[in-house]
Each structure stands twice: as C-alpha cells, then as structure tokens.
A protein has these predicted regions:
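Conserved beta-strand-loop-beta-strand hairpin that lines the nucleotide-binding pocket
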Residues: 1-8, 51-135
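STAS-typified acidic loop motif
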Residues: 4, 9-20
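Alpha-helix initiation/capping motif
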Residues: 10, 14, 32, 95-96
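Conserved short strand/loop->alpha-helix "switch" segment adjacent to the catalytic nucleotide/phosphoryl-transfer site
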Residues: 22-44
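Histidine-centered phosphotransfer motif of kinases
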Residues: 38-56
Length: 135
C-alpha cells in the first residue's frame, strides 16, 4: 500500500533561496526513492519565478512537495504576490529575449500545472508529474 509523503520549507525570496529549493527537492525526492531529475527542473523554474515576480523585501516563499498514494508528485511554490499571476497559457518570448521560457518548460514537463490564489496576499503556482518509486 502506498502512502503520501510531504515536505514543506520556507526559503528566502532570493537567488540563493531558489537554488536551495532545487537542491532540497532533489535530496528529498531521492530520500523517498522517487525520480528527481524532471522535478528538479520544475522546482528551479517555479522558485526562480517566485523570486523574480513574487518578491517582496523581507518575505519568503514556500516550497511544498507531496507524493500522493497514486504516485503523483505535486510541486507547489507559494509567494506573497497574488497580484502578479502567471498567464494560464504561457506565450513564447521574443527570439532574442534572455528570459520568459520558464513556464513553457514547466508546461512541457508537467502533466498539469496552474495557479491557486489565497489566502490573501498569497498565490501558489503548482505542477504535477508522475513519480513512480525508483527501482
């Protein structure tokens, strides 16, 4: 019988916090015996977006990882900028743009992704992907 695993951490809304989110997610998934390569990329993009678009001085962002009994990994990154939500359908940036591809990557790697608002002033950007136990 499968059980649900969950991990939650508050991190500084800085580039260092985003990097730590990626490293912690990799180690947590590894400790649960779950694949981490794809999830690590998704966490990196969502955490970077929280730092870049959801930053409020002195406030943190929260990373939550949950593996359900059906072997689905849900990645959630919560910040305090509900007034800055990502588009439901990410659009490709200009060819010469240096950024703007993160949500396109998340959409390509995840089975599903979206945004939940609340509690005020927060928003959570989430993604779900398969996480079968490693053999």
């Amino acid at each position: 019988m499968n059980q649900e695993n969950s991990f939650k951490v508050l991190l500084s809304a800085t580039r260092r916090g985003a990097r730590l989110a990626r490293l912690l997610s990799r180690e947590q998934l590894r400790s649960w015996g779950r694949p981490f390569e794809t999830a690590e990329h998704v966490v990196a993009e969502l955490a970077n977006n929280a730092v870049q678009h959801g930053h409020v001085p002195g406030r943190s962002f929260r990373l939550t990882l949950t593996v359900s009994a059906t072997d689905t990994l849900r990645i959630e990154v919560t910040d305090v900028r509900a007034d800055r939500t990502p588009p439901a359908e990410p659009r490709p940036p200009a060819p010469d743009a240096e950024g703007g591809r993160g949500l396109l990557l998340v959409a390509a790697l995840a089975d599903r992704w979206g945004t939940d608002l609340g509690p005020v002033p927060c928003k959570t950007v989430w993604a779900e992907l398969p996480a079968p136990p490693s053999r």
